[in-house]
Swiss-Prot record:
GO terms for molecular function: DNA binding; DNA-directed RNA polymerase activity. PANTHER family: DNA-DIRECTED RNA POLYMERASE SUBUNIT OMEGA. Its EC number is 2.7.7.6. The keyword Transcription applies. Transmembrane segments: none annotated. Belongs to the RNA polymerase subunit omega family. This is DNA-directed RNA polymerase subunit omega. Promotes RNA polymerase assembly. Latches the N- and C-terminal regions of the beta' subunit thereby facilitating its interaction with the beta and alpha subunits. It comes from the Bacteria. It is an enzyme of class 2 (transferase). Coiled coil: none annotated. SUPFAM superfamilies: RPB6/omega subunit-like (SSF63562).
Amino acid sequence: MARVTVEDCLEHVDNRFELVMLSTKRARQLATGGKEPRVAWENDKPTVVALREIAEGIVTNEFIAAEEIVTEDPVFAAFEDESNEAV
């Protein structure tokens, strides 16, 4: 298992803050089982796999946007209902 460095990831992402957001979204996709990894899992945690995908240039903001599926989460639906009533 090769180490992933921030510098490897920053070759494909504009800045560290964007890297944090991108890796968080991708790791969450992997952890919840909604998406398949694009690299070998090798007994790593979802965050490491997400960073490896970013370092290899496989996962980008465009990839995440295309892969995101809007789902109705009952927890957030309650907040949306309250905000719609206030208008």
